[in-house]
Amino acid sequence: MSQITDVYAREILDSRGNPTLEVEVFLESGAMGRAAVPSGASTGEREALELRDGDKGRYLGKGVLKAVANVNDIIAEEVIGMEATDQVGIDRKMLELDGTEFKSKLGANAILGVSLAVAKAAADEVGLSLYQYIGGANAKELPLPMMNIINGGAHADNNVDIQEFMIMPAGAKNFAEALRMGAEIFHALKSVLKGKGYNTAVGDEGGFAPNLKSNEEALEVIIEAIQKAGFKPGEDVLLALDVASSELFSDGVYTLENEAQPKKTADQLIDFYENLVNKYPIISIEDGMAENDWEGWKKMTERLGKRIQIVGDDLFVTNPKILKEGIDKGIANSILIKLNQIGTLTETLDAIEMAKRAGYTTVISHRSGETEDTTLADLSVAVNAGQIKTGSLCRTDRVCKYNQLLRIEDELDAVALFRGKEVFYNLKKK
């Protein structure tokens, strides 16, 4: 009864007003799955290809009708008749159909839309929530959220170099409390910024995007907001950064325009991070080095890898092959997991499995162009990832993931697990 009878894709809009793909998969039993595909602003060079039309007369060239046609005319024909419960077989079939390293023929957006919709249809067929279907009986850990409350870099039109300044309510006793703490700090931060005469407009991911005197001032106002909300920095709430430093790297030099000394070598940039880690309760830095600066990554891991989580995003692009190379070379100690960087659910699960076996932490992540789809909330619980990064405490495209996690926590009830600071299991205990 789980045979696929129809697959249909359409073009919809994402949270930035750009087109993206939505796919529906129908089964013989009447079960159905629907999935929408996200899109990134700062992307890694080795990410799977997001297929766009390039027709400047339509959606400024960003239409996805080619990807829609690839689903409706090519992929559908091949997967109709297959069992939706054969996730690996279906994903493998699509990879064979595409036949390219970066999914550039059919488009990773086309392939991922089908891959996720198939999983949702199969879950519907067997009467399970998506997290239970993917993860089985042991899927029970709610993730510690990384909440992006100040946006800079490619995610905002301001003068802040670092792309994301995040809070992690690690002192919370459960996910619902972590969410409440995050929301209260978010509102306190708005008040702090207003009091200093700063703009409180928000960026792509719902964080504030003011022009600040320095990157460090962003940390200062966040600390002030944490205290104003009645919490203790370093105890109740930890900080995390996403530097997206590939965007700052050119000709072997990193340029942080908002710093007194903008030009920095890899060593000087690591000094800069070390100073911040000594001064503020920073537990995690993502993409601290450019994706091709493996020497810089190695140095950063050696100097800071016992103290903080060093996350590879553009570095690893959720790709098991690249991750294996990083593990072998002792680079980073954590991987950011983005479904559309690799393009199938199966390959995503392979990357998570490999990371966990190597003692790397995993952070399930959204993209800056999101939709109302909440798959990644379910995925974070399915694999007991321990951490999720899905934006700020406003904008429905971000909050819908948090709300789905509240539902999952309710459903799991007494079985639900929330580990707070213990998610950083691979760091040296202080």
From Swiss-Prot:
GO terms for cellular component: cell surface; extracellular region; phosphopyruvate hydratase complex. Its EC number is 4.2.1.11. Binds a second Mg(2+) ion via substrate during catalysis. GO terms for molecular function: magnesium ion binding; phosphopyruvate hydratase activity. Its main location: cytoplasm. Keywords: Cytoplasm, Glycolysis, Lyase, Magnesium, Metal-binding, Secreted. It is an enzyme of class 4 (lyase). The active site is at 205 (proton donor), 338 (proton acceptor). It holds the Pfam family Enolase_C. Pathway: Carbohydrate degradation; glycolysis; pyruvate from D-glyceraldehyde 3-phosphate: step 4/5. It is found in: Cytoplasm; Secreted; Cell surface. InterPro entries: Enolase, Enolase-like_C_sf, Enolase-like_N, Enolase_C, Enolase_CS, Enolase_N. Its cofactor is Mg(2+). The keyword rRNA-binding does not apply. GO terms for biological process: glycolytic process. It catalyses: (2R)-2-phosphoglycerate = phosphoenolpyruvate + H2O. Mg(2+) binds at residues 242, 286, 313. (2R)-2-phosphoglycerate binds at residues 163, 338, 367-368, 389. Belongs to the enolase family. PANTHER family: ENOLASE. Catalyzes the reversible conversion of 2-phosphoglycerate (2-PG) into phosphoenolpyruvate (PEP). It is essential for the degradation of carbohydrates via glycolysis. This is Enolase. It comes from Geotalea daltonii (strain DSM 22248 / JCM 15807 / FRC-32) (Geobacter daltonii).
